[in-house]
Amino acid sequence: SVEELYGHGIYDDGSVVREFLGKRKRLYADLLANDYEPPEELQYKTEYVQQIDDYLYKDVTYDAMWHFVGGLFPSPYAATSVREYFARGFEEYTMNNKKELKQSCPVLFNKIEALHALEE
């Protein structure tokens, strides 16, 4: 996978993680404002956590998540971990949804652009 090839280049400077956590904190606040009770870890965990995935999938539901992630994450599942955030962003990039990705996830978009340039 691209992440295995360039993992150090993706996460080392912390920019993708900072962007992801900023989005997770906003998601947390949006969920609270809409009478959900998200786990505290949603604000600061970057790795995959089963409790967070279960909460988003079972309690909020991925259908409802589309309402919260528009303009924030590439998809509901991209909110589950920073690795999934990168993977879904990369998928959007390769599926030619670059404009939307650049608008909603500029740091992630620029990181993928830089990795793409390395391959050429």
Question: What positions do the PLM features span?
Answer:
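Active-site-flanking segments in enzyme catalytic domains
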Residues: S1-E120
